[in-house]
């Protein structure tokens, strides 16, 4: 395995669609790519996983065995994934020259905020790991929505301490003007502050000024990667960041020859 990209983010942001579309784009560009589903509760996936945790973990069995409801069984299932880390590494053994896309559970807390999640990443891919935080483009057009998603992005980074991309998904649902405005907020916290004050008024001013200052000081205000999983717009930029981290910017074929 060249490296693993863990796709994380809140429910409804299009993580699985992004994962499947990126996997297909990499294959179309003639890169070796595989996709792993780590969501034991997924009823439907918009792709055919190469490794599927649902073959080992059944929510119905957990509910029956432990007398749990749907929510409790999801939590138990999320913690059980680490027990099958060896199965995942065994699957990866023959994928020396592959980029691996890891689609994580739909609800962000089931992966990011469980103690087992960092152990999974360490066992499966170690330092050959990076994160793609998937943000919802329509929500991000509101200053408050953008700030909230940046806070979640910071939370994910603080859990894993791996290279991370802020991926603005579903840009096909917003205008080009909206995307450019979000990019301006990213490059200038002052503009974001002004936009937030216009949206919310003065009531929360001191609180959010403090948050924006923290963003600036900790470099949380990082580059945005706008993408559309519908037409693969922006995927070349995602691949470029993966190649930059995993292979020093060399394409897969060059990496194979030298590595």
What are these regions (language model features)?
Residues 216-228:
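Beta-strand-loop-alpha "switch" segments that mediate conformational coupling across diverse proteins
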Residues 162-165, 225, 232, 254:
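Structural and coupling elements of P-loop NTPases
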Residues 248-257:
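C-terminal helical "lid" subdomain and adjoining coupling/linker elements of P-loop NTPases
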Residues 14, 228-246:
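Conserved GTPase G-domain signal focused on the G5
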Residues 109-209, 215:
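Conserved catalytic-core segment of NTP-binding enzymes
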Residues 14, 42-44, 140-142, 173-175, ...:
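Eukaryotic short linear interaction motifs
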Residues 7-8, 37, 101-104, 131-138, ...:
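Conserved beta-strand segments of the P-loop GTPase G domain that flank and frequently precede/overlap
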Residues 2-8, 13, 17-119, 126-130:
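Nucleotide-state-sensitive switch-loop elements of NTP-binding domains
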């Amino acid at each position: 395995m060249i490296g693993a990209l863990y796709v994380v983010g809140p429910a409804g942001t299009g993580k699985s669609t992004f994962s499947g579309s990126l996997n297909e784009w990499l294959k179309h560009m003639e890169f070796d790519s595989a996709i792993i589903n780590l969501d034991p509760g997924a009823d439907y996936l918009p792709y055919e996983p190469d490794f599927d945790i649902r073959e080992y973990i059944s929510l119905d069995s957990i509910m029956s065995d432990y007398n749990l409801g749907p929510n409790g069984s999801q939590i138990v299932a999320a913690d059980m994934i680490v027990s099958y880390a060896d199965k995942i590494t065994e699957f990866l053994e023959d994928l020396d020259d592959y980029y691996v896309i890891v689609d994580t559970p739909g609800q962000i807390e089931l992966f990011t905020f469980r103690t087992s999640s960092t152990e999974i990443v360490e066992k499966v891919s170690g330092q050959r790991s990076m994160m793609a935080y998937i943000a919802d483009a329509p929500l991000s057009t509101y200053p408050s929505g953008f700030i909230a998603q940046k806070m979640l992005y910071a939370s994910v980074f603080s859990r894993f301490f791996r290279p991370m991309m802020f991926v603005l998904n579903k840009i096909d649902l917003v205008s080009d003007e909206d995307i450019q405005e979000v990019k301006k907020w990213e490059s200038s916290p002052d503009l974001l502050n002004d936009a937030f004050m216009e949206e919310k008024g003065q009531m929360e001013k001191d609180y959010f000024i403090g948050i924006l200052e923290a963003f600036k000081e900790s470099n949380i205000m990082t580059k945005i990667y706008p993408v559309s999983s519908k037409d693969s717009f922006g995927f070349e930029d995602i691949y470029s960041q993966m190649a930059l981290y995993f292979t020093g910017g060399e394409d897969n074929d060059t990496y194979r020859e030298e590595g």
